A protein has these predicted regions:
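Mature-chain termini and adjacent capping regions
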Residues: 1-178
């Protein structure tokens, strides 16, 4: 029972830290006081590695925000013989981050607390209203809400370059964390 409690605390620490970070990193822009509901087909705790793995249609909900992936891994910092605060969260396979106003999808995502970043990779699509942006890699600096979309393709003739379609009257772009 203690192992499951430690795993739950570890995952909650990550999600709450996202919820109390600047708006761009909030798990849904919802209140950090909102309860967090995590479900998956299975959960595994590897105490020797300070690692909790939620596998099979993993989903974390807080308020109106949702993180879905095939697998979510939570890495905690080693503190002597026990595990301390969360340092990294990895979402793998069919990643969706959904808020009331935005949906981002990709193949993988990593939240790195030390680097202050969220990186979504692999066929990234972000939608806000009718506006859509696509690329290979989206990097968000959590504290500043600065974002960079990148592509592996280069040059005008190359396919799969970064692309955005923005509709008039919609603000001309996207606002992270809305």
């Amino acid at each position: 029972m203690r192992r499951w409690a430690a795993a739950a605390i570890s995952v909650l620490t990550v999600l709450v830290s996202l919820g109390t970070a600047p708006a761009g990193a909030q798990i849904g822009g919802s209140s950090s006081n909102a309860p967090i509901d995590i479900t998956a087909d299975s959960a595994e705790v590897i105490n020797s590695q300070c690692l909790a793995i939620w596998s099979g249609a993993a989903e974390a909900l807080q308020g109106q925000t949702r993180l879905r992936a095939n697998r979510i891994k939570v890495f905690s910092q080693r503190r002597g013989a026990s595990c301390g605060p969360t340092q990294r969260l990895e979402a793998e396979g069919q990643v969706f981050y959904v808020t009331p106003t935005q949906t981002a999808r990709g193949d993988n995502a990593v939240y790195d607390q030390g680097a202050d970043t969220i990186v979504i990779t692999g066929n990234v699509i972000i939608v806000q209203g009718r506006n859509v942006a696509r690329g290979d890699r989206l990097t968000i600096r959590v504290s500043t809400r600065q974002a960079t979309m990148e592509s592996n393709a280069r040059g005008r003739g190359a396919g799969n370059r970064v692309r955005g379609v923005f509709y008039p009257g919609s603000g001309g772009g996207m606002t992270l964390g809305q």
